[in-house]
């Protein structure tokens, strides 16, 4: 029972470590796995090439505490490898620890908010896509967050609360006190698979300071075919101390977006396509159509080609800004990915 609970409840972290993760240690109810990926990614816009390659490395540790209770810790970091100013940067993607059992799993640290599982309905491409169902900060991957997830038969639920970051008032005298940045918030989501119909429904909500949004999603699987859609609506704070920045906006603006996705698996080849559209304050801020093909040489090694048709035109207005020629370019991406 203990081993079954652990296997089920850390499934999200197991996906991150990958099916090919190496078991470094497993003894007396304690285990440590290592996984990651090495991904070579070429991006071409207007005939100009950029190296967007990256490598990820992660560790998943688990320990049985008693019957029906376990401890878990997870870390994942990412390096970009291009020879430029960002080439030596380490992005600490995940760092969290917590407790789990029949009740689900509770963690604290840097982890995913509750809306990532909703955008995953349409975030299925090897490179492009997922550009319209934009998550506010508290619903995305963020630190200083308490998270809960649970799986109950066909129903999965997630909830997270991000604490406001502490700072001092910098008065440099006896009146100096602790303050916070006011960026606390929460996110909630639920996903339900309807029997053996192939139909799955999802929904979620997030709120942080002056920003908020809700999302609705649905998917249908029929053999080798997969179809999905996501809709989001809410408000984003582009103000001076807001969570977002855009040269065309300077206050709280309405945001509406939707994504459509389809996938067809043919042997070792997977074809995917997505359409993304979003409006900010009534202006079309995202409009693109993407297609890709991925070939799996082995389950842990794949190659792909992806093309994004940018449907925005240079000269179009977004708020008080104008879309540049660079912002309106299409993009071709070629990649090879090795999972370990």
Swiss-Prot record:
The yes or no answer to whether the keyword Acetylation is present is: no
Which coarse location class describes where this protein primarily resides? membrane
Show the GO cellular component annotation of the record. Answer: cell outer membrane; pore complex
Gene Ontology molecular function: porin activity
Q: Which UniProt keywords apply?
A: Cell outer membrane, Ion transport, Membrane, Porin, Signal, Transmembrane, Transmembrane beta strand, Transport
Localization terms from the record: Cell outer membrane
A UniProt-annotated Pfam family? Porin_4
Q: Which domain of life is it from?
A: Bacteria
GO BP annotations listed? monoatomic ion transport
Q: Which residues form the signal peptide?
A: 1-21
Does the record's keyword annotation contain Hydrolase?
no
Indicate how the chain sits in the lipid bilayer: Multi-pass membrane protein
Q: How does it assemble?
A: Homotrimer.
What the protein does comes down to: Forms pores that allow passive diffusion of small molecules across the outer membrane.
* Family as reported in the entry's similarity comment: Belongs to the Gram-negative porin family.
**Protein name, please?**
Outer membrane protein U
Provenance organism? Vibrio vulnificus (strain CMCP6)
Q: Which gene encodes it?
A: ompU
């Amino acid at each position: 029972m203990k081993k079954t609970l652990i296997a089920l409840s850390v499934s999200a972290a197991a996906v991150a470590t990958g099916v090919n993760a190496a078991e470094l240690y497993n003894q007396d109810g304690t285990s440590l796995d290592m996984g990651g990926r090495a991904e070579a990614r070429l991006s071409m816009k207007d005939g100009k090439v950029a190296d967007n390659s990256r490598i990820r490395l992660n560790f998943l540790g688990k320990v049985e505490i008693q019957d029906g209770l376990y401890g878990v810790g997870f870390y994942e970091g990412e390096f970009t490898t291009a020879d430029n100013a960002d080439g030596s940067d380490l992005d600490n993607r995940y760092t969290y620890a917590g407790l789990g059992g029949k009740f689900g799993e509770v963690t604290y640290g840097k982890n995913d908010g509750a809306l990532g599982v909703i955008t995953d309905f349409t975030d299925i491409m090897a490179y492009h896509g997922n550009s319209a169902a934009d998550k506010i900060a508290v619903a995305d991957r963020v630190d200083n967050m308490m998270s809960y997830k649970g799986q109950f038969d066909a129903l999965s639920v997630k909830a997270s609360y991000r604490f406001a970051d502490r700072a001092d008032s910098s008065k440099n005298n006896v009146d100096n006190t602790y303050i916070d940045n006011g960026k606390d918030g929460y996110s909630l989501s639920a996903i339900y698979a309807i029997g053996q119909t192939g139909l799955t429904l999802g929904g979620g909500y997030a709120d942080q300071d002056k920003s908020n949004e809700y999302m609705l999603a649905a998917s249908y699987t029929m053999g080798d075919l997969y179809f999905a859609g996501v809709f989001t609506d809410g408000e984003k704070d582009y103000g001076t101390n807001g969570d977002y920045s855009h040269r065309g906006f300077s206050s709280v603006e309405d945001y509406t977006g939707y994504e459509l996705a389809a996938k067809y698996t043919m042997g070792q080849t997977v074809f995917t396509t997505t359409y993304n559209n979003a409006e900010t304050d009534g202006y079309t801020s995202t409009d693109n159509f993407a297609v890709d093909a991925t070939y799996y040489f082995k389950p842990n090694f794949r190659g792909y080609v992806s093309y994004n048709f940018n449907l925005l035109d240079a000269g179009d207005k977004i708020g008080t800004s104008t879309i540049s020629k660079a912002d309106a370019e299409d993009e071709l991406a070629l990649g090879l990915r090795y999972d370990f």
